[in-house]
């Protein structure tokens, strides 16, 4: 049955409609100027010269990573054939909370690329020691390297009112590495959605970085159609009905010309067809996939919550998940002690019951849950409490929250969490 289902898939090569797949240059659409500029700058490596620092900026899904990665891969292959070791070390700064985490992430990437031990502890070691290990790896394994700092504007770090964002320090240190710390050639490519990014760098980082600017604009509907046409061979022959690509590109054009969303939607439409046992992807599959995307979008808002709000929501979702089978409700009288347990586990500051409830109610404005004020009447001395009801599977919300590295640690405490929840339920005789 499994083999039969695989044979009947609408996909020939599903990877081609994965948004982060590195594709060949001949599949790149509507980015001739940007492609020429990236090629012109990176090809300096082929003459064993250092490429300049680069700043690629523009809205999400406009081809920044796609173009840089496609060119860098080709340059690396050519260099390797010539006996010259060129590498790119990429980190996404979205979930990195500090300069120290960013430097460790670069060490980890270098060690993985070179098949070496990381060689430095993640915690309990100074950032300076991590830099030293990074530079040792670079000296041992490369002749030239480009640090690719994706979503660099999100690396703010733990700032006081007078301190600079962490990305200023990181860019300053990396852009000076080949001058002060190591013998190989080092460049920095910063990728950001923020066109004002350079205005936020401190003066020394701006002077040291001094990048070549490469702006990216939104794709229009015609370009999005061409992008999807160039990936049509991800599907078996005649698997796409005529209206699928125009409709998919139209939905994506409404989302500010984001090619990543267009590709993602086309893949999801194919998945819907597979799930339904259909051998042709139709307009209806696209519309169903778009509805799923819009539902998922509200969950993505959860990812942007502060840590305290995430812990509050996680505690409430856990109470609902560990309740009766199919339960989607959680009492604040149970959820708040669970929140206190979780803050202890994470060694995080605890907030008052009122603040906790304010956090959870705020999440309700994102379409995740509703709340209702209830009275205990004569039970347990009376009083009021809130009953939260989730609009979707609380387990799904927990999994989304666990994408945060810190919250992910809570998944290792499921048994203890369940015991606390059941004990609190017994205390308040609530289900």
Curated annotation (Swiss-Prot):
The organism's place on the tree of life at top rank: Archaea
Protein family: Belongs to the CDC6/cdc18 family.
NCBIfam families, A to Z: orc1/cdc6 family replication initiation protein (TIGR02928)
Protein's organism: Haloarcula marismortui (strain ATCC 43049 / DSM 3752 / JCM 8966 / VKM B-1809) (Halobacterium marismortui)
Function: Involved in regulation of DNA replication.
Xref: SMART domains: AAA
Binding site for ATP: 62-66, 219, 231
UniProt record, GO biological process: DNA replication
Keywords, alphabetical: ATP-binding, DNA replication, Nucleotide-binding, Plasmid
InterPro entries per record: AAA+_ATPase (IPR003593), AAA_16 (IPR041664), Cdc6_C (IPR015163), Cdc6_lid (IPR055237), ORC1/CDC6 (IPR050311), Orc1/Cdc6_arc (IPR014277), P-loop_NTPase (IPR027417), WH-like_DNA-bd_sf (IPR036388)
GO terms assigned for molecular function: ATP binding; ATP hydrolysis activity
Entry protein name: ORC1-type DNA replication protein 14
């Amino acid at each position: 049955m499994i083999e039969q289902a695989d044979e009947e898939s609408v996909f020939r090569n599903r990877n081609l409609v994965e948004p982060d797949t590195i594709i060949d240059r001949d599949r790149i659409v509507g980015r001739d100027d940007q492609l020429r500029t990236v090629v012109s700058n990176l090809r300096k490596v082929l003459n064993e010269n250092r490429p300049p620092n680069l700043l690629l900026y523009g809205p999400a899904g406009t081809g920044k990573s796609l173009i840089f990665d496609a060119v860098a891969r080709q340059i690396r292959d050519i260099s390797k054939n010539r006996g010259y070791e060129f590498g790119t070390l990429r980190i996404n700064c979205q979930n990195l909370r500090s300069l120290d985490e960013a430097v460790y992430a670069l060490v980890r990437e270098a060690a993985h690329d070179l098949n070496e031990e990381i060689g430095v502890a993640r915690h309990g070691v100074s950032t300076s020691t991590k830099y030293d290990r990074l530079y040792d790896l670079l000296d041992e394994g490369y002749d030239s390297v480009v640090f690719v700092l994706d979503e660099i504007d999100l690396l703010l770090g733990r700032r006081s009112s007078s301190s600079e964002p962490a990305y200023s320090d990181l860019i300053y240190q990396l852009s000076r590495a080949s001058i002060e710390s190591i013998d190989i050639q080092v460049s920095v490519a910063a990728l950001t959605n923020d066109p004002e990014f350079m205005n936020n760098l401190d003066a020394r980082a701006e002077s040291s970085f001094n990048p070549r600017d490469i702006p990216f604009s939104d794709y229009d509907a015609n370009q999005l159609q061409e992008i999807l046409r160039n990936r049509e061979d991800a599907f078996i022959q005649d698997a796409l009905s005529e209206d699928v690509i125009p409709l998919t590109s139209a939905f994506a054009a409404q989302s500010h010309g984001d090619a990543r969303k267009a590709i993602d939607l086309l893949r999801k439409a194919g998945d819907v067809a597979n799930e339904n046992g259909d051998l042709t992807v139709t307009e209806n599959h696209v519309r169903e996939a778009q509805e799923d995307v819009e539902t998922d979008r509200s969950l993505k808002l959860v990812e942007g919550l502060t840590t305290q709000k995430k812990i509050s929501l996680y505690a409430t979702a856990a109470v609902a998940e560990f309740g009766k089978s199919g339960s989607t409700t959680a009492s604040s009288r149970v959820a708040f002690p669970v929140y206190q347990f979780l803050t202890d586990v994470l060694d995080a500051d605890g907030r008052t019951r009122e603040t906790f409830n304010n956090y959870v109610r705020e999440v309700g404005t994102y379409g995740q849950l509703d709340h209702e004020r209830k009275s205990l009447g004569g039970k347990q001395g009376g009083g009021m409490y809130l009953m939260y009801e989730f609009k979707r599977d609380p387990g799904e919300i927990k999994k989304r929250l666990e994408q945060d590295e810190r919250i992910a640690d809570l998944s290792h405490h499921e048994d203890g969490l369940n015991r606390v929840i059941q004990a609190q339920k017994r205390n308040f005789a609530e289900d």
